């Protein structure tokens, strides 16, 4: 299913021009117009899924295969020192377009970008309570 009001659906299906790095029947990989670093790309499924919670597991698995293939090519061809694979879900998590997508962000020494978080500290009791809450009523 596609969403006719979704800009990423339009880009993924070729209705809006993009600088395409890879395409198959399910995905289009494009260069990000506001790149974090040189070679920053986006993996877009051609079908509309708002986020990770909507995309079928097999489609998500194939998206990661595309990430490996294209990410390897980006790192090798551009001489990057590493690669961040980023997938945000929800506005508070940094998702700006409600269409599942994966960022491939090549990393270079001293590129000035930081994908970090401040480590927290929880007691053993808090960790156990959180684990129990997540696992409650879970089928084996």
Language-model segments: residues:
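HIT superfamily nucleotide-processing domains
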Residues: 1-140
């Amino acid at each position: 299913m596609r969403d006719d009001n979704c800009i990423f659906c339009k880009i993924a299906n070729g209705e809006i021009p993009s600088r395409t790095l890879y395409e198959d029947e399910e995905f289009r990989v494009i260069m990000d117009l506001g790149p974090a670093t040189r070679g920053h790309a986006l993996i877009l499924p051609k079908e509309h899924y708002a986020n990770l919670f909507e995309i079928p597991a097999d489609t998500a698995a194939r998206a990661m295969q595309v990430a490996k293939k294209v990410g390897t090519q980006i790192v090798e061809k551009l001489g990057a020192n590493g690669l961040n694979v980023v997938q945000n879900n929800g506005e508070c998590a940094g998702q700006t377009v409600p269409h599942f997508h994966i960022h491939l962000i090549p990393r270079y020494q001293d590129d000035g970008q930081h994908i970090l978080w401040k480590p927290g500290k929880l007691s053993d009791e808090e960790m156990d309570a959180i684990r129990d809450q997540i696992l409650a009523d879970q089928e084996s």
